């Protein structure tokens, strides 16, 4: 079984709606698809889930989450994405990520970035563009929306 861990940064936008920071995979396979996902990647060596998620987020966005206390990350559980892969996710309130300042490492083939575009999206938009098995992660964060609206 393959394991991946990822981070879902979120914020409350000017319309008072929760938005999630997601990426569009790079490469020929994805260039014509309107698919967006949390930034995630494989667990290496003896890493714990959160360490993997933080490392992968930085590799795929160039944005460091090192300033955040590990207790600030919200465990969102895991899903079986397919018969060979389990995905674990964490949320973090992180409203100051700027899409245009993000860039990704280069994928295994050396030709394309792992992530070629970044966006903040509301759940209503994202639910049509992401992996259906990942929706539970975003739904768990939406349950906390009022708590963050009050602290905006």
PLM ranges: what are they?
Residues 5, 15, 25, 31, ...:
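Alpha-helical structural elements
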Residues 128-152:
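Charged phosphate-binding loop/patch that engages nucleotide di/tri-phosphates or the phosphate backbone
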Residues 1-38, 90:
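N-terminal strand-loop-strand
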Residues 1, 109-112, 146-152:
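Intrinsic low-complexity, intrinsically disordered segments enriched in polar/basic residues
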Residues 36, 41-136:
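Unchanged
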Residues 30-31, 46, 139, 146:
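A periodicity- and composition-biased signal for non-globular, repetitive helical segments
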Residues 16, 62-63, 150:
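A generic secondary-structure boundary signal that marks alpha-helix termini
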């Amino acid at each position: 079984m393959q394991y991946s861990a990822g981070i879902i940064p979120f914020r409350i936008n000017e319309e008072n709606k929760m938005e999630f920071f997601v990426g569009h995979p790079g490469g020929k396979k994805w260039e014509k698809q309107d698919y967006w996902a949390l930034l995630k990647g494989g667990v290496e060596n003896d890493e714990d889930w959160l360490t993997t998620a933080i490392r992968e987020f930085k590799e795929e966005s160039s944005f460091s989450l090192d300033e955040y206390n590990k207790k600030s990350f919200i465990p969102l559980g895991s899903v079986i994405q397919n018969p060979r892969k389990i995905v674990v996710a964490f949320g973090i309130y992180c409203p100051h990520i700027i899409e245009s300042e993000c860039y990704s490492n280069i994928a295994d083939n050396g030709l394309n970035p792992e992530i070629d575009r970044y966006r903040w999206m509301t759940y209503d938009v994202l639910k049509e563009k992401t992996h259906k098995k990942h929706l539970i992660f975003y739904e768990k964060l939406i349950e906390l929306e009022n708590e963050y609206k009050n602290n905006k």
